């Protein structure tokens, strides 16, 4: 069966933004206009289609990225838009990160009142990292304090982008009644409540001068990206709508310009024009560079490793990337994946090249938030879900077994907060283990491990809300009741000076003994660099087959910690010498020798504890500024900058996570509920010595 929609007419887009900018509402409106839903869903009523987990409907936020397919017709031509709705809450950045990896373009939604908020900056940086072309939608134009020009200015200043407004609002706040389309130079007024009826009208005289200025600026910005248009423009020629659209599309895909639109999704204003803009300016799978990868077992960037490219075409061998695992109450495990090349039919086999496992494709589904449609095959450019994968996890490559390739995986931040959790009853015990392992499969930033010293089960994640949602899902979806401890900071250990160690593990009991001997040089790496292992053995003083055991021993010792039982990070370990015994040496002996060696090296290397520091943004009325600043200082924080926003002050600061637990509640009571704050992980920094001493003593009991 040939594909229904040609590749050029497919758009894989994400709707990304700060929490509460109105992203899910915008997606809901898109689904309504593209005929996928017949009744409008509202987040604040708890009926939004894309928010299908109970927690999302209760909290009014989006936690998981639901993928859905919609159809939209522009000038008589049908297009298919695959939409991924992503969460805006900072505790769920993993969801945003993994969606961006498989998208071709993004719609970034801003709140016209608040403008660019901290999470908008985070999301923007994530989109930059994956070179995702984007358009901006300034939402909530009907709210008191809405300001389109200020938001555009903030996009320019705080995000360092080159925004080009291609629309201008007619009226704002409760008088927002339409937009001027600067490309066609026509006014569009909304006549009915559902925004389905538009009337074209003359541009209102009170904004005519402003519109003319903005239109000229827009034409100039577009012409600057295209030499042919620049010549026509300089010669005073009138540029046609087609020429402007074509050049703006090119510039958007290259990342030179960012078109900006406006509207009020909740009032159904501006969403159809946004759909047109998705088609006009965002790339199809054909417009982006072909995906690149390596052969299994090779590492990109190593000497002599050639990169393989896969063209976006169904004639190429099949290549896909799994970007999300979901435990579905009806069909079990679902793996969402993006097809980069080739095609895939149900009943066929693929190779999971990341894990070197074959996987049979049972059923394929195309998703519409939470109802699904069975399909027989998927093609290059599609996003679909397979049912019941045995071996595939987030970030894995699936490909044609006869032509294997491994794509770059998705990298996720390490968890910064942890808490102990225990089942309430004996019956909950086994159920809890199953629930936690399923939840960890779905979410790569959520970890579960057992504390070696206390035997407690510890869960770790990106923030208090993240862990709260996990415990909540355990209760609802898996019917597990659990008691939880207080949130704890996920400290790390590291060293400050290099250390050399000579470590021997020898055991002689009757019969075969044990013998492992390694010499290690251990050096500190800069923050965030993780772990590097270098094998510098020459002349076979340690046989090659024991080297992986040495690395495993080092990693094991690092994971369990040395001075206070926290994982050791940012180390470079070089194995440069050692010896072995013909009979007594074994992998186990070398593993133990390496593990003992690493622990000794950390003790010698002037060890320190590292603590996570959060980037905090607080919006407070002027009257409480002194109180809020004093409070930040008392929490060992330092203020990086302040700016006025309307009659409020915005404070940006860095504060250690250890002193931020329950901060939102404290802030509310200190400011009579008038200040708001948001925070996200920034970096790890050394803990002051007195505090470190206290923690080490406490851990050692």
From Swiss-Prot:
> What is one Gene Ontology biological process annotated in the Swiss-Prot or TrEMBL record?
ribosome disassembly
Q: Which Gene3D superfamilies match?
A: 3.30.230.10, 3.30.70.240, Elongation Factor G (Translational Gtpase), domain 3 (3.30.70.870), P-loop containing nucleotide triphosphate hydrolases (3.40.50.300), Translation factors (2.40.30.10)
Question: Which residues make up the binding site for GTP?
Answer: 17-24, 85-89, 139-142
Q: List the protein's name.
A: Elongation factor G
Record's subcellular location: Cytoplasm
Gene designation: fusA
Among the GO molecular function terms of this UniProt record, one is: GTPase activity
| NCBIfam families in UniProt | EF-G, PRK12740.1-3, PRK12740.1-5, PRK13351.1-1, small_GTP
Q: Does the keyword S-adenosyl-L-methionine apply?
A: no
Q: Which UniProt keywords apply?
A: Cytoplasm, Elongation factor, GTP-binding, Nucleotide-binding, Protein biosynthesis
Q: Which family does it belong to?
A: Belongs to the TRAFAC class translation factor GTPase superfamily. Classic translation factor GTPase family. EF-G/EF-2 subfamily.
- Statement: the UniProt record of this protein carries the keyword Cytoplasm: yes
């Amino acid at each position: 069966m040939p594909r229904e929609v040609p590749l050029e007419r497919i758009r894989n887009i994400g709707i990304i933004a700060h929490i509460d900018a109105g992203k899910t509402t915008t997606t809901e409106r898109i689904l309504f206009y593209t005929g996928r839903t017949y009744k409008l869903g509202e987040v604040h009523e708890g009926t939004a289609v894309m928010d299908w987990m109970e927690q999302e409907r209760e909290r009014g936020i989006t936690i998981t990225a639901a993928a859905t397919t919609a159809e939209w017709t522009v000038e008589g031509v049908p297009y298919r838009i695959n939409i991924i709705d992503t969460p805006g809450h900072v505790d769920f950045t993993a969801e945003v990160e993994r969606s961006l990896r498989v998208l071709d373009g993004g719609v970034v939604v801003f709140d016209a009142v608040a403008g660019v908020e901290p999470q908008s900056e985070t999301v923007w940086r994530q989109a930059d990292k994956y070179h995702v072309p984007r358009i901006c939608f300034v939402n909530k134009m009907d709210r008191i304090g809405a300001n389109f020009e200020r938001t555009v200015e903030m996009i320019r200043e705080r995000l360092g982008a080159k925004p080009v407004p291609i629309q201008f609002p007619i009226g704002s706040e409760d008088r927002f009644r339409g937009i001027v389309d600067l490309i066609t130079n026509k006014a569009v007024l909304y006549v009915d409540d559902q925004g389905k009826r538009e009337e074209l009208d003359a541009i209102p005289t009170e904004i005519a001068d402003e519109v003319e200025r903005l239109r000229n600026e827009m034409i100039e910005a577009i012409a600057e990206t295209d030499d042919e248009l620049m010549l026509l423009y300089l010669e005073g020629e009138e540029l046609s709508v087609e020429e402007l659209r074509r050049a703006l599309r090119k510039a958007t895909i290259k990342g030179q310009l960012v078109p900006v639109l406006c509207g009020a999704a909740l009032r159904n204003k501006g969403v159809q024009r946004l759909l047109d803009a998705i088609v006009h300016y965002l790339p199809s799978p054909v417009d982006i560079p072909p995906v690149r990868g390596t052969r299994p077992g090779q590492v990109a960037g190593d000497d002599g490793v050639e990169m393989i490219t896969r063209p976006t075409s169904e004639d190429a061998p099949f290549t896909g990337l799994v970007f999300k695992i979901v435990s579905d109450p009806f069909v079990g495990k679902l793996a969402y994946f993006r097809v980069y090349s080739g095609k895939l039919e149900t009943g066929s086999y693929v190779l999971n090249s990341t894990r070197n496992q074959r996987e049979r494709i049972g059923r394929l589904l195309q998703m519409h938030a939470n109802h699904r449609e069975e399909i027989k095959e998927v093609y290059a450019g599609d996003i679909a879900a397979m049912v019941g994968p045995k071996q595939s996890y987030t970030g894995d490559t699936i490909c044609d077994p006869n032509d294997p390739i491994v794509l770059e995986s998705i990298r996720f931040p390490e968890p910064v907060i942890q808490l102990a959790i225990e089942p309430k009853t004996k019956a909950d015990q086994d159920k809890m283990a199953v629930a936690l392992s399923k939840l960890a499969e779905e979410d790569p930033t959520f970890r579960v491990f057992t504390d070696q010293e206390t035997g407690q089960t510890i869960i770790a994640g990106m923030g208090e809300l993240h862990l709260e949602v996990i415990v909540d899902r355990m209760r609802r979806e898996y019917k597990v009741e659990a008691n939880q401890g207080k949130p704890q900071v996920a400290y790390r250990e590291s060293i400050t000076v290099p250390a050399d160690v000579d470590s021997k593990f020898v055991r002689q009991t009757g019969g075969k003994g044990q013998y492992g001997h390694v010499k290690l040089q251990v050096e500190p790496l800069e923050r965030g660099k993780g772990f590097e292992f270098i094998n510098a053995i020459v002349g076979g003083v340690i046989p090659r087959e024991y080297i992986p055991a040495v690395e495993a021993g080092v990693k094991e010792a690092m994971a369990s910690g040395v001075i206070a039982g926290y994982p050791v990070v940012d180390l470079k370990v070089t194995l440069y010498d050692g010896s072995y015994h013909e009979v007594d040496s074994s992998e186990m002996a070398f593993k133990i020798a390496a593990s003992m060696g690493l622990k000794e090296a950390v003790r010698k290397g002037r060890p320190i504890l590292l603590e996570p520091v959060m980037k905090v943004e607080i919006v407070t009325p002027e009257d409480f500024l002194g109180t809020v600043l004093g409070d930040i200082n008392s929490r060992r924080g330092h203020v990086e900058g302040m700016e006025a926003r309307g009659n409020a002050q915005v404070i940006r600061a860095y504060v250690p996570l250890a002193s931020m637990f329950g901060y939102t509640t404290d802030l509310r009571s200190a400011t009579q509920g008038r200040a708001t704050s948001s925070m996200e992980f920034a970096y790890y920094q050394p803990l002051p010595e007195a505090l470190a001493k206290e923690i080490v003593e406490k851990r050692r009991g």
